Amino acid sequence: MGRGRVQLKRIENKINRQVTFSKRRSGLLKKAHEISVLCDAEVALIVFSSKGKLFEYSTDSCMERILERYDRYLYSDKQLVGRDVSQSENWVLEHAKLKARVEVLEKNKRNFMGEDLDSLSLKELQSLEHQLDAAIKSIRSRKNQAMFESISALQKKDKALQDHNNSLLKKIKEREKKTGQQEGQLVQCSNSSSVLLPQYCVTSSRDGFVERVGGENGGASSLTEPNSLLPAWMLRPTTTNE
């Protein structure tokens, strides 16, 4: 059978208690040294006997340095804990403030909408009225400004369109003027060419001969062709149109 579990309790016999303390103290100091060497850990062990006698072990015999490090660790840990507690309290307080602020804003919103007015006093109603009047004035001022800006933009657009139309009309007039000048030049050229051409007048005589009057020399010349060779309608005098 295996060994049963030993129940830990105070040893009543004084001698047995001292012997057990001596054995276990030596084992504890040995274990502390082993863990310090094997694991490269800083170990500080302090043991007081029932009579108040001190037994200790420290890595590299630097008990004070290890204890100072322990104190610094405890202080920083307490600071962190205190800071966390303080921040938690601040968050709780800030949440309460924000919640109250939201409630006030929601109440003001309902009042501006004309709701929940029964609970307001005369002074609060007058203050609400002044706030609404100021808001209406601000809205009207902004509306008038927006209308003025819109009208100004439309006027600028209208002026730009008028300038564009005037430019188009000017171009059309210039083109018409140029076209008229070209037509006038063509008419003058036509008139001058018709003046330079010689004018002739063909007449018929009773003898049956055709006579041509005019020409470059302004004289008359007779054609010797007999009348029988030309029809009568070809013997009509010709006229020139200027």
Swiss-Prot record:
Homodimer capable of binding to CArG-box sequences. The keyword DNA-binding applies. PROSITE patterns: K_BOX, MADS_BOX_1, MADS_BOX_2. Residues 3-57 form the MADS-box domain. Disruption phenotype: Altered cauline leaf shape, abnormal stem development and architecture, including enhanced branching, decreased inflorescence branch angles, and shorter stem and internode lengths. Reduced stems elongation after bolting. It is found in: Nucleus. One of its GO terms (biological process) is cell differentiation. Probable transcription factor that promotes early floral meristem identity in synergy with APETALA1 and CAULIFLOWER. Is required subsequently for the transition of an inflorescence meristem into a floral meristem. Seems to be partially redundant to the function of APETALA1 and CAULIFLOWER in the up-regulation of LEAFY. Is also required for normal pattern of cell division, expansion and differentiation during morphogenesis of the silique. Probably not required for fruit elongation but instead is required to prevent ectopic activity of IND. It comes from Arabidopsis thaliana. This is Agamous-like MADS-box protein AGL8. CDD domains: MADS_MEF2_like (cd00265). SUPFAM superfamilies: SRF-like.
